[in-house]
Amino acid sequence: YTFQDENGRVVFTFPYLNDYTLIGTTEEEHKGDPNDATISTEETIYLKSIISEYFGKNLTNDDIVWHYSGVRPLIEETGKDNRQTTRDYSIEHLQYGNNTLINIWGGKLTTHRVLAEDVLKSLDYHKTWTATEPFANAVNFKHFAHGLINEYPFLDETTAKRLGKSYGKRSLDILKDCKKDKDLGKHYGNGLYEIEVKYLINHEWVKKPESVLLFRTKCGIGMTSSQIEEFQTAFEALINPQK
């Protein structure tokens, strides 16, 4: 759903990970290091208020299981505030002899593919193709998920579907040596097993436990504080086996 408050500010809500609702908005200006961006207390209160009004349920801080923030670059337009500023992007070419430098200004998640295609068009590199080609290792998800469940009956359905959706054909690389449930290694909670964590360390180069829990798998959102603490200790041992 998309909501607007009395001032016209937009708030979005999306179904998320089957059991949650993702709530968000934009237009809060951030100054400083993008890595330091985080939701403010005022923004939290604002989102709880508008969602409580539209959903007819009084949301509290206890309903918040996780939050994250990001910074989106906008192209500055004199005399316009953040709400009026274009969300479009600009591609700049600079030529240094035979070398070309391309700068991209603006852009957002929902335009990343067309932006990339525009860059390639400007280089006469390749005709557009992404609308008809699957992602690398992509599969017919419904059939593939059923295949995983049949091939590895000791996997619960939720975990099998998550692995298939997250890794596609690469989930077979994760599970290739598994013949029984013990081969999955330690279960840290919420469907996260040691064998997947080792794959992420060795093949996706994760360095921090939160990269596993909150970004790669999202399993940490449904884990208890004690499970997270235990995983953090186990992760340190996995990534630094010499210690």
List the model feature ranges, each with a label.
Residues 1-24, 28-241:
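C-terminal catalytic lobe of FAD-dependent flavoproteins
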